[in-house]
């Protein structure tokens, strides 16, 4: 195991560093060898098959180009579940789970109708569905391609979420219902800030889910606020 870790450390240290590099190496080793974290830390001797060696080199090459490991493996963890991801959807972030936790804490004894606007991978809606089984959860996105990913994640995680296509900036098109809660993780990064971000984000994650015009950075928040006044 130590040789494998050293190989990954040497190959990736120019692209990643610190805790991120440590986490990437641990994930690769555990997933490739089919072991848990405890076994990984024992660092027992392992021998890769020829097929595993070829796969490992392919992963290294893609990581060195800046492609996120989550896209390479096609999956990402969120709220104790696994979600399918590809470059059409944002990779779920741990900080987004704090939003889920807050809603669950505030509405644990209620039966709200919740709409996730710009659902992406569906991670927020699906996590809410699992943790608030008494709630009615719906989710929308402007992209049919994105909704395909979200629906697959709902199927995999056995979450009863209803999905539909909708552009949250199109305030002239009414939503199908009134909602008790509108939740969203909308784009908010100014386009001019892209130059200061890592290539793992700017070259691979969907810009439509990240960036807003410099001269109208709050466009999505303004639309959500207006929807909250007219539809919720």
Regions found by a protein language model. Give the residues of each.
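Non-catalytic accessory regions of SAM-dependent methyltransferases
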Residues: 1-35, 41
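Proline-centered flexible-loop/turn and helix-kink motifs
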Residues: 14-17, 133, 159, 206
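Conserved Class I SAM-dependent methyltransferase catalytic core
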Residues: 214-232
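Conserved SAM/SAH cofactor-binding pocket of Class I
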Residues: 95-196, 223
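A general structural signal for well-ordered alpha-helical segments in protein cores
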Residues: 5, 25-26, 56, 69, ...
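Conserved AdoMet
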Residues: 27-105
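Mobile active-site "lid"/loop adjacent to the S-adenosyl-L-methionine
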Residues: 188-220
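Conserved hydrophobic residues forming the short capping helix/wall of the S-adenosyl-L-methionine
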Residues: 12, 154, 228
């Amino acid at each position: 195991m130590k040789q494998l870790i050293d190989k990954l450390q040497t190959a990736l240290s120019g692209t990643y560093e610190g805790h991120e590099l440590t986490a990437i190496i641990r994930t690769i080793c555990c997933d490739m060898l089919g072991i848990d974290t405890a076994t990984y830390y024992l660092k027992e001797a392992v021998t890769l098959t020829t097929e595993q060696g070829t796969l490992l080199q392919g992963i290294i090459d893609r990581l060195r180009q800046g492609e996120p490991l989550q896209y390479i493996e096609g999956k990402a963890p969120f709220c104790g579940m696994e979600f399918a991801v590809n470059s059409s959807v944002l990779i779920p972030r741990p900080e987004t789970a704090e939003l889920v936790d807050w809603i669950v804490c505030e509405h644990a004894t209620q039966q709200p109708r919740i709409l996730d606007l710009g659902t992406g991978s569906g991670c927020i809606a699906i996590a809410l569905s699992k943790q608030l089984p008494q709630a009615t959860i719906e989710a929308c996105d402007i992209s049919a391609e994105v909704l395909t990913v979200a629906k697959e994640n709902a199927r995999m995680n056995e979450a009863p979420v209803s999905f539909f296509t909708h552009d949250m900036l199109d305030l002239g098109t009414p939503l199908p219902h009134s909602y008790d809660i509108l939740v969203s993780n909308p784009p908010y990064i100014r386009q001019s800030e892209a130059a200061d971000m890592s290539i793992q984000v700017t070259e691979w994650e969907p810009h439509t889910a990240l960036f807003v015009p410099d001269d109208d950075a709050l466009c999505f928040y303004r639309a959500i606020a207006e929807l909250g006044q007219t539809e919720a």
